[in-house]
Structures are given as structure tokens and as C-alpha cells.
Amino acid sequence: MKRGDLYWAELRPRSGSEQQGRRPVVILSHDGFNEAPQWRSIIVVPCSTSKLQKGRGPTVVLLTKGTAGLAADCVAVCHQITTLDRSKLTQRLGSLPLEEMRALEAGIRAAIDLDP
């Protein structure tokens, strides 16, 4: 499990407008944490195929079909960064190419108002 990997995850239970259900997530946490067996928490960005999410501006990043094993176009919803127990990750899909990872990082900076 490495930063930039895409996994299927079970996002239940969730509430309100949080992304939920079975969906791809992008691993954000540092590889040092990801590789430590005693560290159970993984920081992720959930993905969505919702057409409503696609128009939400700089905090959503398009990931096209075929990218890192995705079966359909989706968006990484950077304004919904969350922490999961690694047991919620069910299957690795692949790794984001550098260009998409940089776009995701820009989306995160926009979501939490960090300078570039």
C-alpha cells in the first residue's frame, strides 16, 4: 500500500453528504505510515461518478477510465479527505500516474487553502 494507490473501499457507516458505499479511494498518507503494521489509519480521498461532483470546481479532480485500473470516469473528491481503518480497503486497482497525483495534490491544496 503506497501513496497514490487506488483501492476499492467500503465506506460504511457514513452520514449526511459524506461519500459512502463501495467506491475507489486514493491513498494520501505517507508511505512510512502505510507500511507500518501497527499504524491502522490510512488517509484517503474518496472518488465519485456523480455528475453533480464533476462541476464543483478545483477541489474535484477528473480520473479517466483506465487510469490506475478504473472501469469508468470518476472524480477524486478532494474536499472530502477522510481517514479509514485499513481493513476497509478491499482490493488494489493500481497507482495514479505522476500527472494525476499532482492534480490531486492541487485539489487538496484548494480544499484546505494551502499555498502551492
Describe each region flagged by the PLM.
Residues 1-116:
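Conserved functional hotspots at enzyme active or ligand-binding sites that engage polyanionic ligands
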